[in-house]
């Protein structure tokens, strides 16, 4: 399971021009689910993301977590994170989880975030989405867990 996380001032996701999720200050998560991923990996990622101290304190040091600043999460599924571009010019998605398994684990991840006590907004699984965000910093991390 791969997550690209970005510290944001704001973020939103729309489907067919209709806004389906938006947050102010917080973390934007793009989540890719691969074959062999587990609920334990989803739980670990959710806990890590909520507790990661990537927000600045009064001294300007990254020392505050999402819960410390009262932030929210915008979680968007992105199966292309499972893409492999090593051969040829077209990405291969052979390692991506099948849609039903991907949705189950994405939903589990969203539930795990909510159980951490933070507000969560989402996109729509398998939809063609338009994502807009203001990356604060910029601050971006890639997290992986199997």
UniProtKB/Swiss-Prot annotation:
What biological process terms from GO does the record include? D-amino acid catabolic process
GO molecular-function annotation terms? D-tyrosyl-tRNA(Tyr) deacylase activity; Gly-tRNA(Ala) deacylase activity; Ser(Gly)-tRNA(Ala) hydrolase activity; tRNA binding
* Location, primary (coarse class): cytoplasm
Q: Which UniProt keywords apply?
A: Cytoplasm, Hydrolase, RNA-binding, tRNA-binding
Q: Which domain of life is it from?
A: Bacteria
Where found in the cell? Cytoplasm
Q: Give any Gene Ontology cellular component.
A: cytoplasm
- Annotated catalysed reactions: glycyl-tRNA(Ala) + H2O = tRNA(Ala) + glycine + H(+); a D-aminoacyl-tRNA + H2O = a tRNA + a D-alpha-amino acid + H(+)
The record's section on InterPro entries has:
Daa-tRNA_deacyls_DTD, DTD-like_sf
Q: Which cysteines are joined by disulfide bonds?
A: none
Question: Which enzyme class?
Answer: hydrolase
Which NCBIfam families would you find in this protein's record?
A: D-aminoacyl-tRNA deacylase
What binding partners and quaternary form does the record give? Homodimer.
Domain commentary: A Gly-cisPro motif from one monomer fits into the active site of the other monomer to allow specific chiral rejection of L-amino acids.
Q: What does this protein do?
A: An aminoacyl-tRNA editing enzyme that deacylates mischarged D-aminoacyl-tRNAs. Also deacylates mischarged glycyl-tRNA(Ala), protecting cells against glycine mischarging by AlaRS. Acts via tRNA-based rather than protein-based catalysis; rejects L-amino acids rather than detecting D-amino acids in the active site. By recycling D-aminoacyl-tRNA to D-amino acids and free tRNA molecules, this enzyme counteracts the toxicity associated with the formation of D-aminoacyl-tRNA entities in vivo and helps enforce protein L-homochirality.
Q: What family is it from? A: Belongs to the DTD family.
- Report the protein name in the record: D-aminoacyl-tRNA deacylase
Originating species:
Trichlorobacter lovleyi (strain ATCC BAA-1151 / DSM 17278 / SZ) (Geobacter lovleyi)
What lineage is on file? Bacteria, Pseudomonadati, Thermodesulfobacteriota, Desulfuromonadia, Geobacterales
